């Protein structure tokens, strides 16, 4: 009998899951996320552009960008009637956040209440990734 823990043991904890986006230009994408969505660059490599990767943070939410020269994300939106999401970000203040970006050209779908109770809106970044911001509305 082994003394090693099982995969579901409480001492083996997953701390987070990080959506990872392939992009052609990590630096330009990181700047877009900072300017339009309030993310900050928590780290990047190497120390100067062109970066191979960057980690972006907004509160506890993290996104990772990985450089693939010439990469273009395929449009998967036609695979299901509701569209295709690349990341779902749960947040407090979703209504207030929506008001700060409302009417911008990167809004993919407006703030709506879903049948399951969440208020959500969608953003499409310059690389074609669709992020959903959802939570309780606070308007």
Task: Outline where the language-model segments fall.
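Vicinal oxygen chelate
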Residues: 2-20, 31, 40-90, 98-124, ...
